[in-house]
Amino acid sequence: MTFESSSAYDIPQLQPTEFVPANLAAWNMPRHREYAAISGGALHFFLDDYRFETVWSSPERLFDRVKAVGASLTPDFSIWVDMPRAAQVWNVYRARWCGAFWQSQGIEVLPTACWSTPDTFDFCFDGIPDGGTVAISSMGIRSSKADQALFRAGIQELINRKQPQLLLAYGRLRYCDDIDLPEVREYPTFWDRRRKQVSDSWEDGAAKAVPDQGPEPATSAAQEPVELDLEA
């Protein structure tokens, strides 16, 4: 099955959408998917590639999982620095193909952008609609200045080439303080949610462990400071 493309690599062109998900649910988490299905959310693939390889290898068999939610980001197949160029192009092609297939079946689809070194810029943004919404994530960016610089360069190139009106960031969008960004909407990661759950649970437990002390007693007149006349 092939889809319309203006790319030199025949990477499928996605259609624009105004849909903005209320939340993002991981492809491999059933309860998160169930919540997304009833709350206007969308699937995301900011996971290890092996966890969602089957969206490409068995698209029809796994389509019901996408259909149950009704909206999805495109798969985030990795583009590693040390990958052969052919493999990098292949992963971009697969990601857009899945998105185009889902769109053909009535699913709301938002493109996920990823990149590697600047020599990937000639193809890694192919198929992303101009002036639309694009999903990204700075998760996994290592602390080295070189990695952070590559991430910033990709963000700037995405803006220059596609002029997105909205960026959907999985997790806090870091390393971009010096870039003139469009509107950004950040979504909590799985670990953000877990930390909040643990924190809320601890606070609830602490409140139950400490008995109610009642209202704070008023300060009596005897407890008020007395000014002494030292010159008497």
Show where each model-derived region lies.
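C-terminal accessory extensions appended to soluble enzyme cores
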Residues: 1-19, 181-232
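Eukaryote-skewed repeat-based solenoidal scaffolds used as protein-protein interaction platforms
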Residues: 31-35, 39, 43, 53-201
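Basic, amphipathic N-terminal segments that precede the first structured/catalytic domain
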Residues: 1-46
